[in-house]
């Protein structure tokens, strides 16, 4: 089961946290659609900023949006002008006052989403898929990853028949719930069709919060 399911989804509430935090009741569907639309719009708008995650919280009658990015300067702009424009746009979309936070991703080589997007961009620039995968694996392990697994699927190298190619180095224990595994996907639109990229990065083990607190009490 651990091999098939989304590794972040299965660890929610154990060692991973939700990207959206709010309680809605009857407005659940409305809030969910707003979140999906906002994430898609921001991803398109901030493509050059290497956005990893967008966290959305909705305390009473306002919203807190946190953007995790490898290039915060691109979003903030000159004298913080970009961030204010973006905050107004998000506020108009959500219909409530918005507090916008920008957080820097210190090690983009260990962020599965950014690694997957990096490989996808290289494939669009006609870099050989094996070279792009090897480069990503090497830089992730140098940055301190315990293990990494990459899957690239589609008409690789313009082949007639689509196939999947895997590259794996180190440990990626998908069945171990305390294993901190980051997972990211991306699509590369090439002249031969779409190539899908999946990345799993194992960063080490985290003891679940309950276990840790009981151990410290003893």
From Swiss-Prot:
GO terms for cellular component: cytosolic small ribosomal subunit. It comes from the Bacteria. Keywords: Ribonucleoprotein, Ribosomal protein, RNA-binding, rRNA-binding. InterPro entries: KH_dom, KH_dom-like_a/b, KH_dom_type_2, KH_sf_prok-type, Ribosomal_S3_C_sf, Ribosomal_uS3_bac-typ, Ribosomal_uS3_C, Ribosomal_uS3_CS. SUPFAM superfamilies: Prokaryotic type KH domain (KH-domain type II), Ribosomal protein S3 C-terminal domain. One of its GO terms (molecular function) is rRNA binding. Residues 38-106 form the KH type-2 domain. CDD domains: KH-II_30S_S3 (cd02412). Binds the lower part of the 30S subunit head. Binds mRNA in the 70S ribosome, positioning it for translation. NCBIfam families: rpsC_bact. Part of the 30S ribosomal subunit. Forms a tight complex with proteins S10 and S14. Belongs to the universal ribosomal protein uS3 family. This is Small ribosomal subunit protein uS3. It comes from Legionella pneumophila subsp. pneumophila (strain Philadelphia 1 / ATCC 33152 / DSM 7513).
């Amino acid at each position: 089961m651990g091999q098939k399911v989304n590794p972040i989804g299965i660890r929610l509430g154990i060692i991973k946290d939700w990207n959206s935090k709010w309680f809605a009741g009857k407005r659940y569907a409305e809030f969910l659609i707003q979140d999906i639309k906002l994430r898609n719009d921001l991803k398109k708008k901030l493509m050059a900023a290497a956005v990893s995650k967008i966290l959305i919280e909705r305390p009473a009658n306002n919203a807190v949006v946190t953007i995790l990015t490898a290039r915060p300067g691109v979003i903030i702009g000159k004298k913080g002008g970009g961030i204010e424009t973006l905050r107004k746009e998000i506020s108009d979309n959500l219909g409530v006052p918005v507090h916008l936070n920008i957080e820097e991703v210190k090690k983009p080589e260990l962020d599965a989403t950014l690694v997957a997007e990096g490989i996808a961009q290289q494939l669009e620039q006609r870099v050989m898929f094996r070279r792009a995968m090897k480069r990503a694996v090497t830089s992730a392990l140098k940055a301190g990853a315990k293990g990494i697994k990459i899957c690239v699927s589609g008409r690789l190298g313009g082949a007639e028949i689509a196939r999947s190619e895997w590259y794996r180095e180190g440990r990626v224990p998908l069945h171990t719930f305390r294993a901190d595994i980051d997972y990211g996907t991306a699509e590369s639109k090439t002249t031969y069709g779409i190539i899908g990229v999946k990345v799993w990065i194992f960063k080490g083990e985290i003891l679940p919060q309950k276990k840790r607190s009981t151990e410290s009490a003893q």
